[in-house]
Amino acid sequence: MARKALIEKAKRTPKFKVRAYTRCVRCGRARSVYRYFGLCRICLRELAHKGQLPGVKKASW
């Protein structure tokens, strides 16, 4: 879990646009966040396996 200060810092509009970054809305992780879901890869996988993300299913080929 990310520190609350870092989560609040990410919400602010930065002085320069390139400094903006996404954080996972569930755990606050800053790396590997899927913009479409707003979740990091770990939370995305957990919720997909539980069936809590509509339209997401496990790939098999």
From Swiss-Prot:
A Gene Ontology cellular-component term: cytoplasm
Cofactor(s) for this UniProt protein: Zn(2+)
PROSITE patterns (alphabetical): RIBOSOMAL_S14
Keyword terms, alphabetized: Metal-binding, Ribonucleoprotein, Ribosomal protein, RNA-binding, rRNA-binding, Zinc
An example Gene Ontology biological process: translation
Cofactor-binding details, from the entry: Binds 1 zinc ion per subunit.
GO molecular function: rRNA binding; structural constituent of ribosome; zinc ion binding
UniProt superkingdom: Bacteria
Keyword hit for Metal-binding: yes
Gene3D superfamilies: 30s Ribosomal Protein S14, Chain N (4.10.830.10)
Residues given in the record as Zn(2+) binding sites: C24, C27, C40, C43
Pfam families: Ribosomal_S14
Record's function text: Binds 16S rRNA, required for the assembly of 30S particles and may also be responsible for determining the conformation of the 16S rRNA at the A site.
Subunit architecture: Part of the 30S ribosomal subunit. Contacts proteins S3 and S10.
Similarity-based family: Belongs to the universal ribosomal protein uS14 family. Zinc-binding uS14 subfamily.
Descriptive protein name: Small ribosomal subunit protein uS14
